[in-house]
């Protein structure tokens, strides 16, 4: 029996040593913190039950990894130890009882609490108020000299402020990278085609341990003090919290969430509050640190081999876990975006059981190098959708399969389009795809499109949910009798909707093109298309080269147009709409030598337009040769005034400028 336990211990120690080096020395962890904690807890349990098997080189007897050879070594005068962990209120109660049993007369009623920052522990030595040395924690006894790098961190004072500081004082704290700085750093790396950091902790560690301090200087690092080590030449407060305030007065930053609390129940409430607000904080944390506030009590309680007896880290539920990627399904969003969704072996992470996670897009799949069958690290933070952040490469099975993005929409089988320079792949079946149905119909009847009065969002949603319509053409097949089955839709309201649909059949080519919901074809672009090609048939048949000749249309919009009209299903819906009576007046072609009706005219738009969108009206006027300006002057030739026109109309009247209505504008366009 003892032999099998011995083998288990040796395997655990070897595994923990390996991952400690990956985490503390190489800044390249392969497993999440929760997995390392679990292995350590297993080791401690076996060693506690079999004390004769404890060895001097066990991970339980040390704090971290050895320093790299690239930095000179610094021996800590007082060891920089780590903390024991609590994972529940029961663990916290047990911690408190251990202290009470060991020091029954000590002042254990007051606590100093702070968020447990996810960064790199450092020691700062000030002599006569000047920073002379900075070191990493290393293995707790020996760290790395990172003085030149630390000098580049703006939140760390090179000289202490105020007065009264000790002749020699060692300040300990955490160097970290705020979330905003981390996001910006990775964004810049992507633009340069460089490797991105997995998380802010890795970014902070990698930045702080650069051999070239000029690189560190460019990284958005920050620092919060959390304790004091060596002190010579002055007496400090007997309160841990008051020492924080003294350090702050000397110019050393402390975490603003640090609190002095008077009971263990207050500590538990503090933990819950910080956990609730975790995702709103500017920095990554993975728990709270709880310390006895009284320094004399700390000295009485003392230390075990690897941690103080007077402090503990109360960890949050794990936000990262390892699980299996069983499959990948592709979902189609309301705008046609196709998103790969990882189907996972269910795992409890971030307080919930997770079985699905987003993989975002094909670029993200390539960046992760993930395959079906991989063991993956899954992360869930707060309300953020769970996502895969890394692959555990050494667990990849031989049967792992590549993830292949579909060429056809998994919902409607239309072609999938991915424009060069865009990360997202999209379904091109905008008018027929069930996944996009509600948004396509809402857009089709909107005021700037066919403007169907009375056919609002809730009515559209009911029509789709009850499977009464599939495409925009189906709207014109509805009868008043059918519509009355909808909620809050009586006979009169239903008849009004039918009348509005019939009225909407009389439109313009520009509005019709806009109503189709083709990506990036807005009112102005639709108007430019209508004025350039004159007929729907020519728009549908236009090649990429012909489309880019149209004003304001580039390669991307041209690709969207050709993709849309190349789909037979989309063209079939367009044909149905025409057959059902949707029509518009013909746009007369203008001969090359014929002057445009508003050629050279300076035109101003004012007031509210009920039939045209402002950008649509502006594009139409420009197509007729006008120069559209924003203010009325003596140079203005025509003012088109909509409803509730104000000072521009008054000024135009005073100047004797020709004034026309929106109806005049529509007639001119037609």
Curated annotation (Swiss-Prot):
MF GO annotations: DNA ligase (NAD+) activity; metal ion binding
UniProt-annotated binding residues for Zn(2+): 409, 412, 427, 433
InterPro entries linked: BRCT_dom, BRCT_dom_sf, DisA/LigA_HHH, DNA_ligase, DNA_ligase_AS, DNA_ligase_CS, DNAligase_adenylation, DNAligase_N
GO biological process terms on file: DNA repair; DNA replication
Cofactor: Mg(2+); Mn(2+)
Matches recorded under Gene3D superfamilies: 5' to 3' exonuclease, C-terminal subdomain, 6.20.10.30, BRCT domain, DNA ligase/mRNA capping enzyme, Helix hairpin bin, Nucleic acid-binding proteins
Domain BRCT stretches: 593-670
SS bond list: none
Source superkingdom: Bacteria
Catalysed reactions, as listed in the record: NAD(+) + (deoxyribonucleotide)n-3'-hydroxyl + 5'-phospho-(deoxyribonucleotide)m = (deoxyribonucleotide)n+m + AMP + beta-nicotinamide D-nucleotide
Enzyme active site: 116
Entry binding sites for NAD(+): 33-37, 82-83, 114, 137, 174, 291, 315
Pfam families membership: BRCT, DNA_ligase_aden, DNA_ligase_OB, DNA_ligase_ZBD, HHH_2, HHH_5, Nlig-Ia
Bilayer-crossing regions: none
GO cellular component, one term: cytosol
Record EC number: 6.5.1.2
Keywords, ordered alphabetically: DNA damage, DNA repair, DNA replication, Ligase, Magnesium, Manganese, Metal-binding, NAD, Zinc
Known role: DNA ligase that catalyzes the formation of phosphodiester linkages between 5'-phosphoryl and 3'-hydroxyl groups in double-stranded DNA using NAD as a coenzyme and as the energy source for the reaction. It is essential for DNA replication and repair of damaged DNA.
Family note: Belongs to the NAD-dependent DNA ligase family. LigA subfamily.
Protein name: DNA ligase
Biological source species: Vibrio atlanticus (strain LGP32) (Vibrio splendidus (strain Mel32))
């Amino acid at each position: 029996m003892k032999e099998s336990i011995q083998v288990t211990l040796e395997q655990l120690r070897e595994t923990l040593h390996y991952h400690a080096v990956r985490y503390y020395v190489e800044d390249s962890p392969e497993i999440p913190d929760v997995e390392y904690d679990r292995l350590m807890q297993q080791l401690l349990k076996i060693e506690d039950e079999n004390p004769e098997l404890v060895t001097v080189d066990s991970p339980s007897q040390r704090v971290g990894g050895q320093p790299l050879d690239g930095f000179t070594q610094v021996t800590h005068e007082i060891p920089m130890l780590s903390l024991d962990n609590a994972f529940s209120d029961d663990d916290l109660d047990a911690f408190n009882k251990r202290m009470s049993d060991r020091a029954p007369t000590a002042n254990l009623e007051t606590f100093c609490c702070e968020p447990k920052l996810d960064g790199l522990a450092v020691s700062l030595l000030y002599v006569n108020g000047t920073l002379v040395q900075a070191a990493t924690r290393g293995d707790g006894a020996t760290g790395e000299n990172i003085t030149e790098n630390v000098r580049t961190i703006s939140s760390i004072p090179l000289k202490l402020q105020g007065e009264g500081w000790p002749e020699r004082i060692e300040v300990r704290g955490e160097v970290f990278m705020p979330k905003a700085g981390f996001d910006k750093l990775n964004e810049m790396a992507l633009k340069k085609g460089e490797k991105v950091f997995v998380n802010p902790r890795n970014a902070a560690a990698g930045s702080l341990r650069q051999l070239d301090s000029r690189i560190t200087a460019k990284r958005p690092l920050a620092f919060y003090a959390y304790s004091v080590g060596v002190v010579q030449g002055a007496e400090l407060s007997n309160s841990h919290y008051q020492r924080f305030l003294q350090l702050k007065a000397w110019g050393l930053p402390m975490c603003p969430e640090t609190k002095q609390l008077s009971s263990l129940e207050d500590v538990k409430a503090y933990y819950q509050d910080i956990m609730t607000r975790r995702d709103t904080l500017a920095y990554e944390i993975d728990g709270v640190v709880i310390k006895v506030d009284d320094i004399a009590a700390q000295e009485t309680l003392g230390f075990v081999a690897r941690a103080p007896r007077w402090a503990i880290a109360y960890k949050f539920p794990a936000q990262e876990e390892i699980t299996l990627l069983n499959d990948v399904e592709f979902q189609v969003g309301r705008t046609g975006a196709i998103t790969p969704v990882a189907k996972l072996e269910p795992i409890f992470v971030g307080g919930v059981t997770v079985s699905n996670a987003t993989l975002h897009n094909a670029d993200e799949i390539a960046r992760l190098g993930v395959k079906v069958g991989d063991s993956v690290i899954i992360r869930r933070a707060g309300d953020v959708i769970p996502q895969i952040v890394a692959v555990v490469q050494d667990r990849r099975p031989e049967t792992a399969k590549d993830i292949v993005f579909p060429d056809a929409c998994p919902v409607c089988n239309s072609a999938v389009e991915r424009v060069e320079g865009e990360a997202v792949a999209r379904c091109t079946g905008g008018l027929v795809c069930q996944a996009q149905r509600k948004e396509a119909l809402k857009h089709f009847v909107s005021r700037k499109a066919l403007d169907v009065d009375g056919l609002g969002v809730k009515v559209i949603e009911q029509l789709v949910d009850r499977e009464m319509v599939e495409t925009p053409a189906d709207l014109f097949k509805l009868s008043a009798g059918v519509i009355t089955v909808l909620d809050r839709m009586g006979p009169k309201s239903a008849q009004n909707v039918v009348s509005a649909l019939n009225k909407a059949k009389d439109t313009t080519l520009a509005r019709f093109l806009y109503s189709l919901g083709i990506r990036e074809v807005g009112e102005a672009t639709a108007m430019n298309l209508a004025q350039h090609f004159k007929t729907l048939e020519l728009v549908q048949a236009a090649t990429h080269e012909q489309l880019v000749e149209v004003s304001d249309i580039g390669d991307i919009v041209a690709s969207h147009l050709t993709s849309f009209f190349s789909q037979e299903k989309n063209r079939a819906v367009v044909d149905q709409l025409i057959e059902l009576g949707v029509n518009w007046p013909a746009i007369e072609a203008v001969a090359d030598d014929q002057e445009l009706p508003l050629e050279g005219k300076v035109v101003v738009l004012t007031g509210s337009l009920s039939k045209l969108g402002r950008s649509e009206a502006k594009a139409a006027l420009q197509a007729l040769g006008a120069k559209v300006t924003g203010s009325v002057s003596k140079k203005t030739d025509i003012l088109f005034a909509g409803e509730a026109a104000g000072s521009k109309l008054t000024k135009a009247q005073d100047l004797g400028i020709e004034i026309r209505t929106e109806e005049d504008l529509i007639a001119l366009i037609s």
